[in-house]
Amino acid sequence: MSNSRQHQGHFARKRFGQNFLVDHGVIDSIVSTIGPARGQRMVEIGPGLGALTEPLIERLATPESPLHAVELDRDLIGRLQQRFGALLELHAGDALAFDFRSLAAPGDKPSLRIVGNLPYNISSPLLFHLMTFADAVIDQHFMLQNEVVERMVAEPGTKAFSRLSVMLQYRYVMEKMLDVPPESFQPPPKVDSAIVRMIPYEPHELPDVDPVLLGEVVTAAFSQRRKMLRNTLGDYRETIDFDALGFDLARRAEDVSVAEYVGVAQALAAVRKAG
């Protein structure tokens, strides 16, 4: 596989984190994993040169119900519009600022399926942005750096367990679906990739916790990973009765379950409401 940044006459742009998927066997496996069906509301983030776009359109799009795509690179937008016409509705702009809820069906029922080969340089911020639309989403399938996927699905007590693990596992059921080697891309990235499936919990399955407070607690806990929680969560010891929660502060952040972090955030909310 050539290391050239040019593919199909387009130079991959480093500032956009562009690595184009070119292995048709991998593309077929990804599409089979997604399982698109006619008439579904699907959004592709970063369609690039259309490697996934084409088979997705073949399986689900009609002029009345097109595949939606969010693309930042204006050079690619023109090519995609010319190639797919009315079967692809393109939204020019940055996915980090895009209102995905604007594409959902009317009503409260989840209706969106979101897919994409996400730019690795913005993957974590983009995942957190997408979390704000989770109530409108049926599922998400993303190509990401394998290290990020491992952190997303990591169990407590492992080195990969992180702030990203806690915040996403609170909101989604997640599963690593496929490994994708560097040679599947043009130009090949310097890291291994993987496909992850993310299914949002339904409202009745979610714990009653303010995600902002949960994020505050988790960020503090993981701010110095090698230190004990009695140090990183020390500022909360005057307001939260950790003993009453059965929460052992003589641990490190990666040794605490999602449910335990939720419990601390709930206790913090109760204290602040009372105060």
UniProtKB/Swiss-Prot annotation:
Main localization, broad class: cytoplasm
Name the enzyme group at the top EC level.
Answer: transferase
Q: Where in the cell is it found?
A: Cytoplasm
Q: Where does S-adenosyl-L-methionine bind?
A: N19, L21, G46, E71, D94, N117
Which Pfam family, giving just one, matches this sequence? Answer: RrnaAD
Keyword annotations from UniProtKB, A to Z = Cytoplasm, Methyltransferase, RNA-binding, rRNA processing, S-adenosyl-L-methionine, Transferase
Which EC numbers characterise this protein's activity in its record? Answer: 2.1.1.182
Q: Which reaction does it catalyse?
A: adenosine(1518)/adenosine(1519) in 16S rRNA + 4 S-adenosyl-L-methionine = N(6)-dimethyladenosine(1518)/N(6)-dimethyladenosine(1519) in 16S rRNA + 4 S-adenosyl-L-homocysteine + 4 H(+)
Which InterPro entries does the record cross-reference, listed alphabetically?
KsgA/Erm, rRNA_Ade_diMease-like_C, rRNA_Ade_methylase_Trfase_N, rRNA_adenine_dimethylase, SAM-dependent_MTases_sf
From the UniProt record, which GO molecular function terms apply? 16S rRNA (adenine(1518)-N(6)/adenine(1519)-N(6))-dimethyltransferase activity; RNA binding
Job of this protein: Specifically dimethylates two adjacent adenosines (A1518 and A1519) in the loop of a conserved hairpin near the 3'-end of 16S rRNA in the 30S particle. May play a critical role in biogenesis of 30S subunits.
Which family does this protein fall into?
A: Belongs to the class I-like SAM-binding methyltransferase superfamily. rRNA adenine N(6)-methyltransferase family. RsmA subfamily.
Classification via NCBIfam families: ksgA
Q: Report the protein name in the record.
A: Ribosomal RNA small subunit methyltransferase A
The scientific name of the source species is Burkholderia lata (strain ATCC 17760 / DSM 23089 / LMG 22485 / NCIMB 9086 / R18194 / 383)
